[in-house]
Amino acid sequence: MALLRGLLVLSLSCLQGPCFTFSPVSAVDLPGQQPVSEQAQQKLPLPALFKLDNQDFGDHATLKRSPGHCKSVPTAEETRRLAQAMMAFTTDLFSLVAQTSTSSNLVLSPLSVALALSHLALGAQNQTLHSLHRVLHMNTGSCLPHLLSHFYQNLGPGTIRLAARIYLQKGFPIKDDFLEQSERLFGAKPVKLTGKQEEDLANINQWVKEATEGKIEDFLSELPDSTVLLLLNAIHFHGFWRTKFDPSLTQKDFFHLDERFTVSVDMMHAVSYPLRWFLLEQPEIQVAHFPFKNNMSFVVVMPTYFEWNVSEVLANLTWDTLYHPSLQERPTKVWLPKLHLQQQLDLVATLSQLGLQELFQGPDLRGISEQNLVVSSVQHQSTMELSEAGVEAAAATSVAMNRMSLSSFTVNRPFLFFIMEDTIGVPLFVGSVRNPNPSALPQLQEQRDSPDNRLIGQNDKADFHGGKTFGPDLKLAPRMEEDYPQFSSPK
């Protein structure tokens, strides 16, 4: 079982001029609060917060508004481009986050961040709108929010729940068109706040707690006086393995931190697991798809060497590399560590590096309000639990990939992972694990194989090249050239 929950908050605040009192937009009403509009939706987007402030821009340039009409159902080509764009955005975003993080493990939802940015794009104009599209690798005008909205509303029922809410300062003048599109596309609508910080904080944090089923509490500790608008979205993913792991087979085993040190972890095990997996060459990276129900997968991306960084690995992973619905499942012995990850991130610096610094200096958001607004905060929090039942959470190139001839797949070294939607191949969550048990004291490796390698060596020796077991230092090579399926990235 996999359980993942994510929260993103985008804040806009006043830099000059008076600030008004706070009020929220939401798909779910909070106790004791009245929404501005009466229709409610129960769509839950990953919690995201954008804070906006008032800012004086001086003379306004001529507006360049996006066309207001988009197809209600995207074409197959538009859907494919969306999936490719989301993979490219995921690579850009996670590479930068990993560069500056000091955590041994990371998890975030690129879908949540993209939803928040596309929500903001509903009110963006001119260069600000172009910048948002460029960073999201989309050239679809105002149709980007529609594409993302159509995607998440058509995810498998019972697997993904999305919630959105807008908080506005009381009396803040917001445009009706922005409110209407926010509600229609994201299920978000305004609900008045009291203007009392303690009470408003409690209400916001209670909504976050309910939207993430109690996994994210006390998300906000304060509301700056300059804040006039908050955009929040929350995603809850509860994925059950299509083939469950037997808890009685879970046992302590070694996870190799590097060539010298290991930590003890709870390792789930299955003797014959339906796995789609292959070896990507140059550099050698193993990729395995563990299927969930409802067309989702937990995708492990594990280099066969220790000295790697996230940017280096992701540079070799295009959408075509990961998304291979024609790849056949093979009965495989697997070992997979149980995980419990939690991450809180401030994304202002990361988004600025991606090319959105304008959001935090002088954006054109007159599609939201004639007031001068600036984004002052972007906060994101995600949690993930991986257990026997499943997961809960919160240029043209030619690539050669080899179906590995081994009948075992052991996740016992640092790896990246994705939660992927398998129908079109959109990444919902992404993360990296370098130490699944950071509270444990690392130990020097013993001068012997780990228990899992001994077991594999005894039972499957005929399947290994030269009789070697698949250990941390083994370089894999296929037996025959015809075993290599050839894949090319789209131009």
Swiss-Prot record:
Q: Where is this region: Disordered?
A: 439-491
- Which Pfam families does the UniProt entry name for this protein? Serpin (PF00079)
Site (Reactive bond for plasmin) residue list: R403, M404
Give the record's glycosylation annotations as residue positions. Answer: N126, N295, N309, N316
Query: Which keywords does UniProt give here?
Result: Acute phase, Disulfide bond, Glycoprotein, Protease inhibitor, Secreted, Serine protease inhibitor, Signal, Sulfation
Q: Where is this site: Cleavage?
A: Q39, A40
Q: Which residues carry this modification: Sulfotyrosine?
A: Y484
What Gene Ontology molecular function terms does this protein carry?
A: protease binding; protein homodimerization activity; serine-type endopeptidase inhibitor activity
Where is this protein chiefly located?
A: secreted
Q: Where is this site: Reactive bond for chymotrypsin?
A: M404, S405
Q: In which tissues is it expressed?
A: Expressed by the liver and secreted in plasma.
Q: Modified after translation how? A: Proteolytically cleaved at Pro-35 by both the prolyl endopeptidase FAP form and antiplasmin-cleaving enzyme FAP soluble form to generate mature alpha-2-antiplasmin.
**What are the residue ranges of the propeptide?**
28-39
Q: Where in the cell is it found?
A: Secreted
Cysteine pairs bridged by disulfides in the record: C70-C143
One GO BP annotation is: positive regulation of smooth muscle cell proliferation
Q: How does it assemble?
A: Forms protease inhibiting heterodimer with TMPRSS7.
Similarity section: Belongs to the serpin family.
Q: What does this protein do?
A: Serine protease inhibitor. The major targets of this inhibitor are plasmin and trypsin, but it also inactivates matriptase-3/TMPRSS7 and chymotrypsin.
Descriptive protein name: Alpha-2-antiplasmin
Organism from which the protein derives: Mus musculus
